[in-house]
Structures are given as structure tokens and as C-alpha cells.
Swiss-Prot record:
Binding positions for Ca(2+) 1 per the UniProt entry: 260, 266, 312, 314
SUPFAM superfamilies from the UniProt entry: C2 domain (Calcium/lipid-binding domain, CaLB) (SSF49562), GTPase activation domain, GAP (SSF48350), PH domain-like (SSF50729)
Gene that this polypeptide is encoded by: gacEE
Domain Rho-GAP stretches: 381-567
Native organism taxonomy: Eukaryota, Amoebozoa, Evosea, Eumycetozoa, Dictyostelia
Cofactor(s) this protein requires: Ca(2+)
Annotated protein name in UniProt: Rho GTPase-activating protein gacEE
TM region(s), chain numbering: none
Disulfide bonds: none
Length: 570
């Protein structure tokens, strides 16, 4: 890369919109550049600002000793603005040391990403169910009244955008829309229109929040209400059980918010679907990280989402939230074709500092599953129901199949990625049906990961999780303070006897897996990521609490690490 010569040329200076409300005007100036590389057909065209140019000048002076630049401070309003920027471009194009500098490389990457991202946002908004500028008021609080560009995507998600660069146009096809920044999203699942009047409608969400949206005209109000009602019908039709898998790759992010004092961040991504999650590696000191990390989950609910949460790692305090996106499974092609999605990161609330987008590659395989759970089924019934309805297939109030699974897995403790590598969805469905109908199953050693998938599925489909809904808040509150062993033991003692007996079976088994982590790569931390969300979950899963999601893993890890002391006490 060092031998490649970069030529940068100023293509002009033009007016742009400043940071005003959507309906207001106002102009500032931007500089347009074109970058070419020797021996390459790649050409970059991007726009930047006076402040970005001055930041580049400052960083070049810090990075390159005794550098001689033609200008020390750039003013885009100066009478010599075009001449000055051309002199700077000539200096950079004729100085290989500047072209190879980290400051210049980062400048090109950041400013080009910002321009590409703006174009992406324009296309993202344009290709939607409906969009328009509305006044949004939350819970009838006038202080929350904000003018937002509202967009419904995938017939499932309501996005709202504000501007980082303003404009005077409300036309969706206007280039001014490129200046928008995502300010939040709401899922239309379990939402309903509770009131409609002249030029306004009220939307009630699943967590009982109300939003009043005021439209410019009554006709537009009618279009919004009709579209939302159609979306609600679509969601209802998409609600059914499946046997499937979602696979994909978190490719990269761009233009992330700086969370550290050095102007960078240390981002990582947590991906979640149903009661499963995966954490990517951390990419240190980057606002444009390349992850290229694969994920896969088993799926039982077609109406669900795959969530992506971006965090900034911090060694001395809790990770900082950097944004979220959600992909509805019903959006994805039913034939398993892979699609690539650029999605804008969304904040949780107005206090979050969030910017940037994330690129995901994703594919979804599924087949419809049975709708109702038989009272005699092993999968989908509570532990108490299994013990009551099928006592002949239980031992110590534990389903015999769990003993059989564990006996089989203990013969494969050195299997790399046990419980982490995805099994074949068709095989998992076959195993599930076999368990539901036969008292004894024959295990195939060549399908270890399929049996591991069926084992995980049993705990995900429990109507009452192993650690119980009643103790969710107590366990989360304990973890928020700092997990202590004795209070944890006292909480565990309150579990129903069948839950305790299953835990007594699992903990020694997990200890054996962790003891062989050098070969199977499944230490206590990885086990907690796989099983924690299944063992401990909130009753209403329609809203994902990000901080609690991390605490769930911490609790599970603490239980696994202290299993010997816990077993002695229960």
C-alpha cells in the first residue's frame, strides 16, 4: 500500500444546509474532493467541511516532524479559499510521506464513509412502506414534541430521523434527506391506533407508551393510519412457530461515535435472537471497524427479530452503548438466499450519543412447525408439567432425556465448539420429534452438534426458565450490586424442586466441559453466553434490556464458576 501514489483534487466549493430544523433554511459551505490511486481504477468522490480540513492540518503537524504545509489554518469563506485548498491538495499529492500518514489515511476513510453513508440514508428512507415529516409527541408531554422524518420499514419497524445538516425541503426525494440521522425506532408488534382526528393519530405501543403524530394534511393522516393497520395485519400473519436457523456475518461498521478521549472507540457487537446471543471480538481504536465475524442461531418464532447491539469496551467501567439495529426474520428471503443489509444505528433514548451504520450479511432457513404443544410433549412444556404428565420418563423429577443427552456429550468433551457450532436444522427437528415420541433415542456420534442444538432448544422452549421468572429481578439486582455467593445460593434454594434437580445435573456436566476448554473452546464464559439467556430471562421479551442482557451472562458465569460451593449448599 505504501507504494501507491494518491492524487487528491478539489472539485469545488459549494453551499450546503446548516444545522436547522427541517422546515428552515440557512446555508454553509462544503468542499468537494476527488481522490485517485496510481495503478488503480478506484476513484473516491466525497464532501467535507472546513473543520475537517483544519483537523487534518493539525494532525499532520503532530504526526510528521517539521512538515511544511502551504496553509496553517483554512477558512472556507476567505477570498482565497479555493486557491488555498488547491495548494494543500498539490502539497499532499506531491508528498508520499503525507499520503502514507495515518492522519491522511484516516481523513480519506472517514470523510468518504460519511458521504457514502449520507447516500445510503437517502436510499434507506426512499425504499420504505411510507415516510413523511411529522410532529411526534410522547405520552402527551409537550416537552417531547419534536419534528421528525418518520419512516416505516419492512412493515415492522417505525424509524424516525432528524438532521445533522438541515434543509428546507420536506420532499422525500430531495437530496436534503441525505442529511438525516436516525434518532430512534419502535417495533410495530402489538401496537395499535387508539385515536384518530383531523391531521393527527395516536399510536399505543406494547409497553403502554403513547405517541401522537401530527401530519401536514388529513389525507396524509389517512395514509399513515392505513399503512400502520396493514403492517399490524402483516405481523399477525407472520406469527407462527418454525423450525429454522438464521446465519450471517457482522461485516463492518462506519462513522461510529467517538467514546474515548483519544477520539476513537473500542467497538464490539452483541447479536441476539430469541434466547441466544453471540459477542464479536473487540476492534480497538477504530470508528470504522472491520469485524467479519460469523453468527448463527436456531429459530422457533417466525415473527421474531435478530438484534445487533454495538458497544464500546471499557476496562474500568461498564461498556458504553453505541447503537442498535433489528432485522425482522419475516423480511428475509424464505429460500435461504443471503442478503446484505446496511442499517443505520439507532439510539435507545435522546441521551445516547449514536452515529453510523452497520453492514450485515444474513440468511434464514425455516419450515413451519407444529402450532400447539401436546400435553405429553417433552419440548415446549414446563418441567413441572413433564414431571406431572409423564412421570414414567422422569428420574428424580428430571426428564430422562437430559440424562441421555449428557451421557452422550460426555463421550465428546473434546469436540471443538460443543454447543457453539450450529447443527443442521433438519436434524435438530428430527431429534426433537424423536424425543417427543420415543422414551429412548439412539445417538449418532457424527451428529454431535445437531444433538447439542436439540439440547439447547429444550431449555429455550421451556415456558418457565430454569432460574424462574419470579427470581429474575432478584438475580439482576444482585448482579448490579456485585454478585455474592451466599445471597445467590439463597435465591437458588427458592427454585422448584424439579428445577433444582436439573441444575444439580447440569453444573457438574458444565464443569467437565470447562475443564476441557483447551480442546472444545467452551470455557465458563462461553457457556454462559450460550445458556445464560435461556436459563434466565424476563417474562415479557418484547423489549430487550441491553444492560440486563450483559448481567444475565455474568450471573450464569458466576453460577458455573462456583458450582461446587453451590452444589454443597442446595
Amino acid at each position: 500500500m505504501e507504494s501507491v501514489t494518491t492524487t487528491i483534487q478539489c472539485m469545488g466549493i459549494k453551499d450546503s444546509c446548516n444545522k436547522k430544523k427541517i422546515f428552515q433554511g440557512g446555508k454553509s459551505k462544503i468542499i468537494e474532493f476527488q481522490v485517485k490511486y496510481e495503478n488503480s481504477d478506484e476513484v473516491l468522490n466525497f464532501q467535507t467541511t472546513q473543520s475537517a480540513i483544519n483537523k487534518l492540518i493539525s494532525e499532520l503537524k503532530k504526526e510528521i516532524y517539521s512538515i511544511n504545509l502551504p496553509i496553517s489554518n483554512y477558512s472556507v469563506t476567505s477570498s482565497s479559499a479555493l486557491q488555498d485548498i488547491n495548494l494543500l491538495c498539490q502539497c499532499i499529492s506531491s508528498t508520499p510521506k503525507i499520503q502514507r500518514s495515518l492522519s491522511f489515511v484516516n481523513f480519506i476513510e472517514t470523510e468518504n464513509n460519511l458521504t457514502v453513508s449520507s447516500t445510503f440514508i437517502f436510499d434507506f428512507i426512499k425504499n420504505s412502506d411510507i415516510s413523511g415529516v411529522l410532529l411526534k409527541t410522547k405520552n402527551n408531554n409537550k416537552r417531547t414534541k419534536k419534528e421528525r422524518l418518520c419512516v416505516i420499514k419492512y412493515s415492522r419497524v417505525l424509524y424516525y430521523f432528524s438532521e445533522t445538516g438541515g434543509g428546507s425541503s420536506t420532499d422525500i426525494n430531495s437530496t436534503e434527506v441525505k442529511k438525516k440521522r436516525c434518532k430512534g425506532l419502535k417495533f410495530l408488534d402489538d401496537c395499535k391506533i387508539t385515536e384518530k382526528g383531523e391531521n393527527y393519530f395516536q399510536l399505543k405501543t406494547s409497553n403502554n407508551e403513547t405517541y401522537v403524530f401530527t401530519t401536514p394534511t388529513n389525507d396524509e393522516c389517512d395514509r399513515w393510519v392505513t399503512t400502520i393497520n396493514n403492517c399490524i395485519d402483516y405481523i399477525t400473519k407472520s406469527t407462527y412457530r418454525v423450525s429454522g436457523q438464521v446465519q450471517g456475518t457482522v461485516v463492518k461498521s462506519r462513522n461510529l461515535a467517538a467514546k474515548d478521549l483519544n477520539g476513537k472507540s473500542d467497538p464490539f457487537v452483541i447479536i441476539k435472537a430469541e434466547q441466544q446471543q453471540h459477542r464479536t471480538q473487540t476492534i480497538y481504536k477504530s470508528l470504522n471497524p472491520q469485524f467479519n465475524e460469523a453468527f448463527h442461531f436456531d429459530i422457533t418464532k417466525h415473527q421474531g427479530y435478530v438484534y445487533f447491539f454495538v458497544w464500546d469496551e471499557d476496562k474500568f467501567k461498564t461498556a458504553d452503548f453505541m447503537g442498535e439495529v433489528a432485522v425482522p426474520l419475516s423480511l428475509l428471503p424464505p429460500n435461504g438466499s443471503e442478503i446484505s443489509l446496511w442499517l443505520p444505528l439507532s439510539p435507545r433514548n435522546s441521551k445516547d450519543k449514536v452515529s453510523g451504520d452497520i453492514l450485515i450479511k444474513i440468511r434464514y432457513f425455516f419450515s413451519p412447525d407444529q402450532i400447539e404443544v401436546s400435553p405429553t410433549s417433552i419440548y415446549g412444556n414446563s418441567l413441572e408439567a413433564i414431571v406431572k404428565n409423564r412421570p414414567e420418563i422422569c428420574k428424580n423429577q428430571v426428564p430422562n432425556i437430559l440424562y441421555q443427552f449428557i451421557e452422550f456429550f460426555e463421550q465428546h468433551l473434546n469436540e471443538e465448539g460443543l454447543f457453539r457450532i450450529c447443527g443442521n436444522s433438519t436434524e435438530i427437528k428430527f431429534i426433537k420429534n424423536q424425543v417427543n415420541t420415543d422414551t429412548q433415542i439412539t445417538f449418532n456420534p457424527s451428529s454431535v452438534h445437531a444433538y447439542a442444538g436439540a439440547f439447547k432448544l429444550f431449555f429455550r422452549e421451556l415456558p418457565e426458565p430454569l432460574f424462574t421468572f419470579n427470581q429474575y429481578d432478584n438475580l439482576i439486582n444482585l448482579a448490579k450490586k456485585s454478585t455474592e455467593l451466599q445471597p445467590l445460593i439463597e435465591i437458588i434454594k427458592t427454585f422448584p424442586i424439579c428445577h433444582l434437580n436439573v441444575l444439580k445435573l447440569l453444573l457438574p456436566f458444565f464443569g467437565k466441559i470447562a475443564a476441557n476448554s483447551k480442546s472444545n473452546l467452551m470455557n465458563h464464559s462461553n457457556l454462559s453466553i450460550v445458556f445464560g439467556p435461556s436459563f434466565l430471562r424476563v417474562k415479557d421479551e418484547s423489549h430487550v434490556n441491553l444492560m440486563e442482557m450483559i448481567l444475565v451472562n455474568d450471573i450464569a458465569k458466576f453460577v458455573f464458576e462456583n458450582s461446587q460451593q453451590i452444589l454443597k449448599s442446595i
